[in-house]
């Protein structure tokens, strides 16, 4: 049995505050998208032996964060569904230009988009890519792709139980699937997962570095952390006990720290 992680890329950077229909339109990750990808690294990096991804920038950038020490293998058939005449347009513009189709899709999300690849075609394309990847690889692997092709693929495997929209997943989340001894994908718990890794020092630094803070901001952050830890050392020498690395990041100290202060206030 092998583990297969189907991951949706981190949140992309849109041109403005509007929401966009971005099938194969190539947007890079936003600041939040980079942070989401580093959290995926914290959760999955030591669990996988290879990572495959869509050729779109938002997927490749996510894959690079997840396994910085492993090359990510780009597979064209893992790309997002082509959304035809709507691809790359804001939903406000789509609503104005195709009001009837927009309304129809509000009732039926699979109502055809002009010129778009069908969900079935994109699901079959993605399914064939998964088959080839499993056939030519070993160990536990991650696939970094997109919500539409992932949901279309899972719907093909489980259409008797759920509608296709059931399988859509938020940016920076993933499905954890397994294979049988013949490398056939086995569906069990089909609940998407959000990463919740332990926030150790190295991961916190990776989160900070992923958003490319200006040097002076980064230096200020380091100086504040150093000073906060110095204050914590001073307090600990007078009987206060708490986790200085975590409490220095909180606006309000932990309850354990407050309790310690009350019980040791006479030791000053």
Regions found by a protein language model. Give the residues of each.
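Short glycine-rich phosphate-binding loop at a beta-alpha junction
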Residues: 48-55, 140-144, 245
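Active-site flanking loop/helix segments enriched in acidic
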Residues: 199-223, 256-267
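Phosphate-coordination/substrate-recognition cap region in phosphate-metabolizing enzymes
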Residues: 38-102
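Active-site-adjacent alpha-helix immediately C-terminal to a catalytic or transition-state-stabilizing loop
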Residues: 60, 68, 127-184
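Acidic, low-complexity terminal tails and accessory targeting/binding regions
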Residues: 1-2, 75, 81-93, 155-211
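Divalent metal-dependent catalytic cores for phosphoryl transfer on phosphate-bearing substrates
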Residues: 237-268
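Short glycine/proline- and acidic residue-enriched helix-loop micro-motifs
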Residues: 101-121, 207-212
